[in-house]
């Protein structure tokens, strides 16, 4: 017997919208997967009652103070870089990873193809790409003009035991990404999609292993366990919380016995070096994705999120952790390229808490930097010493993250992980001359938290009836384009 109340209709005016008695679909999060889900439901024309819930702000109200005051203020209750409409996408460098027509699988972006097949995934990406183009994405594709040159670089990489993954990329740039998502936000509102901002989903309402709705409260009450919550009912609920929601999702899985597999955590650094060293990679591919198992441990090490003439940035995740990232703009340019070097960590028995492990690494690094991102010269690491501010001022590579504190990242990054990173840099130096220049900079921590991978069926439904998962949060995708594609398919599954 249900104990849920009859709320009446409409039961509440909230955030400027008349809340429905019950929604057909509630979507938790407003990243690309959620946006494209709602967009596609509008195209399908079924007039479903849809509610999107987001812990951050409207996109036009998302502002990071770091550019004005030169340091991260750790905005409360949530970081504007990672939370708000379009998630981290609005302030990312805006790279849309496509695919090569001859590819028989997907090497980057996630595993959507494992649920819908390779051909269907390609069709979904094409469809999402047309929407981005409709809203103003650059028509130019990076990484398709210089096939012979890319083949030569790939050949050199193979000799070092490293694979080069080269795929077409549509680069939006941070400015254009912001504009595109603002226009999509307006479109959803114009088409009667209800959106609640600055609101957290405190809990899922589940009875007899079937979703009934969600419990919400204002984001400002996130740390107040005594705060009152309100219930919103729904036929179906879609979890689309992104990597930012990894910790929340683990809690929900544990509390409600939602079936999931253990995830991984990627731990590493943001590497900054002159454009002149990376000029061939930047010209021929814009972003080179290098993956290898080098050094004594044979762990998977990869480059990620390369930003030619870009800027290193700081952002804040749960528990007030400062993490490093990188961005690039269409107009604003530096003379440096930055990219992540990440080591994948899997745990089995007896310890199997990858998110906790990554958080502890980040916390220790933050403490060494007095709450700030740490930066260190590569040459100082080889010499076994910390980097001092005066040395950084004389360095030929000028850091683009001015708030970073010089120090010693090896105090907090484990020996195995650090060895993997340094061995990878040495191998890359044989592919890209100057990659191991002692003046190159390592910023830490760069950590990618992936939640437990939810066990879902081909319709993206979890082990709880009526509860679905899409995007990066539940482990299906890793990036803007495939997350967008997963939202489109979710809409069709719900239709």
Q: Which ranges hold each PLM region?
A:
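Dinucleotide-binding Rossmann-like beta1-alpha1 core, especially the glycine-rich loop
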Residues: 83-142
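Short intrinsically disordered terminal tails
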Residues: 14-16
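Residues forming the flavin
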Residues: 5-11, 20-103, 109, 146-495
